[in-house]
């Protein structure tokens, strides 16, 4: 089991690093635009990219393009796994990354924000 909170995936160690506890429900509701199918889901994946991590390799805008592609691939894989395990997934791209980042203890301007994917049991 895993405690509620914000976690950052560490690719070198293939582990989750705890960042912070979840913010109050009201702030989360505001951050996702009061979309009930997202607010009430038990699991949320937020796909982000950090240009600083790969800028040494791609010294141009290729690093940004590469991050967008990776964010897209990751979002697709999360949704495919949810479907394969008979769960419902819903992705949104309009959310308040500033609220989420602030509560997670991150500088929201340092990342490329992709999608927020809510995953939960099917309603049927």
Regions found by a protein language model. Name each.
Residues 1-124:
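Acidic, surface-exposed loops and disordered segments
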């Amino acid at each position: 089991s895993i405690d509620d909170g914000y976690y950052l995936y560490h690719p070198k160690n293939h582990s989750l690093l705890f960042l912070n506890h979840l913010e109050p429900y009201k702030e989360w509701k505001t951050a996702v635009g009061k979309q009930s199918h997202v607010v009430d889901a038990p699991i949320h994946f937020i796909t982000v990219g950090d240009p600083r991590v790969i800028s040494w390799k791609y010294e141009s805008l290729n690093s940004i393009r590469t991050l967008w592609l990776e964010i897209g691939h990751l979002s697709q894989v999360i949704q495919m796994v949810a479907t394969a395990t008979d769960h419902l997934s819903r992705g949104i791209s309009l959310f308040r990354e500033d609220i989420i980042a602030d509560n997670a203890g991150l500088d929201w301007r340092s990342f490329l924000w992709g999608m927020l994917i809510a995953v939960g049991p099917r309603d049927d």
